[in-house]
């Protein structure tokens, strides 16, 4: 009976070899990528984004002297000393006399609309030999009016004969009048008129005094 095992091995050897060849061929096709399929794709090659800008510009009444927010660090210019809204020390005031009147223009030359607009008066400080407090005797009347196409709109009063030391921490100009918010424009603006007058009740204690008070305009973007 020794011949039987040899015949059995001979009968199945070709089948095993064939199966091995088929597996090798399939594996080879898979590895070399010769098997293919339909595909589809889209590449969006132009995906961009940008931010808008808020740029405040203040000029004198003639539009010849100008300060820009971009002149300072972080779009906040803190050294605009060329535009004096209280009239300066040359035009000296007397009790109940004529006021110092100054006008300025506020523009938004950026690309983003102004959503909030405030004016923050700083601390009024006096100097001079008098013993009285001139900050409490000088009164400010402030109005604003939009100017579109060279034509001024209706003026709105923001302060009406308020003492400089009582102006408060901040004035919400948009809340007072949305028409006084500068548009996004290089030509249209808001005109602010500052009128500073010495109270008729002022006495000799405020003679030979002067005052100084910083004013901070702030735009907030939409």
Label every model-predicted segment.
Residues 2-222:
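Long, small/polar-residue-biased beta-strand-and-loop interaction regions
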């Amino acid at each position: 009976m020794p011949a039987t095992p040899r015949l059995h091995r001979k009968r199945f050897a070709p089948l095993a070899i064939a199966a091995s060849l088929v597996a090798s061929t399939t594996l080879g096709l898979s590895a070399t990528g010769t098997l293919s399929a339909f595909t589809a794709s889209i590449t969006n090659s132009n995906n961009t984004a940008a931010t808008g800008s808020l740029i405040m510009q203040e000029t004198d009444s003639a539009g010849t002297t100008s300060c820009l927010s971009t002149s300072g660090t972080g779009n906040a210019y803190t050294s605009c000393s060329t535009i004096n809204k209280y009239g300066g020390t040359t035009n000296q005031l007397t009790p109940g006399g004529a006021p110092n009147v100054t006008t300025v223009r506020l523009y938004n030359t950026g690309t983003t609309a102004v959503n909030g607009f405030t004016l923050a008066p700083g601390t009024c400080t006096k100097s001079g030999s008098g013993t009285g407090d001139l900050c409490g005797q000088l009164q400010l009347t402030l109005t604003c009016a939009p100017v579109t196409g060279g034509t001024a709109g209706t003026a709105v009063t923001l302060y009406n004969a308020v003492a400089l030391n009582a102006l408060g921490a901040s004035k919400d100009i948009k809340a007072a009048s949305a028409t006084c918010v500068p548009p996004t424009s290089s030509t249209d603006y808001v005109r602010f008129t500052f009128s500073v007058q010495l109270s008729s009740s002022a006495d000799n204690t405020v003679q030979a005094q002067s005052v100084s008070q910083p004013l901070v305009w702030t735009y907030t973007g939409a």
